[in-house]
């Protein structure tokens, strides 16, 4: 989803401008990953100068850390909200799962977290990835009250959702009945229809990427 930019000559309060830069960073890091992203690309997406980005965050590393941490913050906030007032374990899983699907329809959040969780080898970001993943686990288990096994199953389903949406399978589901069958096992009918509508807003896949692949 495109972020709103200020009109020419309009000045935003510092807090709003920071939010604007972090929203832009989420999109740029999501699309390009940490290595491919640049502070210049984030600056252009946010409608500010590169110098302003660096002055605000200090470095690309610091910007990435804050961006991914905020993505995890949003994820945890969604889980907490969905869990409020829910009593049965089955309803809890259903409500939080539905809320998560709606959240990661934002590809910036989805892909930024996916990039982070593949960086366990990274000198600086490896520990961050482990800490943020376990932060989610601890909220689900210790705060919301899910059992360790239920939490494991929920996280596994979440990672499957991440993979399916990251590959943009919902964009090409009409081309392959097996994809439709898989998606029907993962998402509700309402979720599938919603994701299909969102897929129409994506940059179209190249024709060669839309056909069915066979071995």
Region annotations inferred by a language model:
Residues 12-17:
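Short, Lys/Arg-enriched anionic-surface-contact patches
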Residues 91, 95, 99, 112-115, ...:
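Amphipathic alpha-helical interaction segments
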Residues 104-123:
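Amphipathic alpha-helical segments used for helix-helix packing
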Residues 1-5, 215:
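Short, intrinsically disordered or compositionally biased N-terminal tails of bacterial proteins
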Residues 69-75:
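Short, basic, alpha-helical segments at the C-terminal edge of helix-turn-helix-like DNA-binding modules
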Residues 20, 24-62, 66:
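Helix-turn-helix
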Residues 123-134, 140-215:
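Hydrophobic/aromatic-rich alpha-helical bundle segments in the mid-to-C-terminal region
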Residues 66, 77-107, 203:
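Hydrophobic alpha-helical connector segments
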């Amino acid at each position: 989803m495109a972020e709103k930019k200020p009109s020419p000559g309009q000045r935003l309060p510092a807090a709003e401008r920071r939010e604007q830069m972090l929203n832009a960073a989420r999109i740029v890091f999501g699309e390009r990953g940490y290595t491919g992203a640049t502070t210049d690309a984030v600056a252009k997406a946010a409608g500010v100068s590169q110098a302003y980005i660096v002055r605000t965050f200090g470095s690309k590393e610091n910007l990435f850390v804050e961006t991914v941490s905020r993505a995890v913050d949003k994820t945890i906030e969604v889980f907490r909200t969905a869990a409020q007032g829910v009593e049965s374990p089955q309803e809890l899983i259903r409500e939080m799962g539905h809320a998560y699907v709606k959240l990661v329809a934002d590809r910036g959040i989805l892909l930024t977290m996916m990039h982070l969780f593949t960086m366990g080898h990274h000198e600086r970001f490896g520990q961050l990835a482990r800490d943020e993943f376990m932060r989610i686990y601890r909220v689900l288990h210790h705060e919301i009250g899910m059992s360790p096994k239920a939490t494991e199953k929920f996280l596994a389903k979440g990672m499957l959702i991440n993979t399916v949406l990251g590959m943009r399978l919902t964009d090409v589901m009409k081309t392959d009945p097996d994809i439709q069958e898989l998606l029907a096992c993962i998402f509700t009918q309402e979720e599938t229809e919603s994701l299909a509508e969102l897929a129409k807003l994506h940059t179209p896949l190249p024709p060669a990427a839309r056909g069915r692949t066979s071995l």
